[in-house]
Amino acid sequence: NYIFRNLLKIFDVIIQDNKNIPSYQMQCRGCAAKVDFNSLKTTLSKEIITTSEDAININNYPKLYQSVDMISSIVSDPYLLGKIAANHAISDIIAVNSKLISALMILQLPYSNSKINSRDLEQVISGASEVFKLAGCSISGGHTMVGKDKDPVIGFSVIGEKKSVNKKNLNQISLELKEVS
């Protein structure tokens, strides 16, 4: 699967770029920063949270799955950050054997002047759009804000449509799942 091979290359670049920094630790505050499932399950009603799956089925629409993912900056390049965040969000949809059909961006940039914010916004969108285009989708909107974090925080709310499994595509789906695992 092209998207996952691309994501692995991106992470290899991150590791290579940071391997000479003795105190380097990945601190993306993405998946590693999630509130644990038991806390969520205890606090939220069973109607809100029923599973720990990466993407959930949308009620009354058996073929539609939705997910949301966010990460803070693990690289200084906004373009590359956009690509990483898009791949991160898409992987949840692929994990439930679905094709991406919609993406909304959630982005917080650090307080800065308009010129820097415009430049960073353009770069994040450009990187993410490149990845979403490969997945057959585009960013259709979202929400932006500025905040006190010194680094950008980016996320996507994504929707996918479940792929049907038949004799013709069973081998292809099996190969895609092997590449993911």
Regions found by a protein language model. Name each.
Residues 5, 10-96, 140, 163, ...:
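N-terminal glycine-rich phosphate/pyrophosphate-binding loops that anchor nucleotide-derived ligands
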Residues 64-66, 70-72, 99-181:
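Glycine-rich anion-binding loops of enzyme active sites
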